Amino acid sequence: MLSLPTCWAVPLQKAVNKMAVPHTITMTSRDFTLSDHDVHVWCASLQQPAVVVDQLTRILSSDEKDRAARYHFEHLQRSFIVARGILRVLLGHYLHIQPAQVEFTYLREGKPQLSERHAQKVSFNLSHSHELVLYSFSSSRNIGIDVEHIRPMEDLELIAEHNFSTREIAELK
């Protein structure tokens, strides 16, 4: 069994302000019990050693492997495999099944959701950007999470001039 990324158990009324980004997937034993008022937030690096990528590839469905292969760049293929593989490992723990047994259905825009068989047990969401992936899990409600890599933008004023009103530009300054 693969070791897992870092986890925070977050009460719904609290926010995680600063998260350390692990560069390896490590974890000691964890409680995968979600109370009605908990949200679990997991964080992992998409940069994983080849041996981990190989292990995660083995638990993906054939559809997921095909989707990964459609990415033109190898680093995007690896990122998809790592993000989806870790999702399967985490869901396997929450659902008490093997990661390869997790079944997804897909919304029209391609977002994965648990198949009907497991959908009532846990709700999840994931977001990835640059080298980081975040996962959120809840047992009592639909959940979302978002992460965005912050990068310098030298042409920010030019972008604003083309996309925002004069009032919006003034508020940005």
Q: Where do the PLM segments sit?
A:
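Core catalytic alpha/beta fold that binds nucleotide/phospho-ligands
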Residues: 2-173
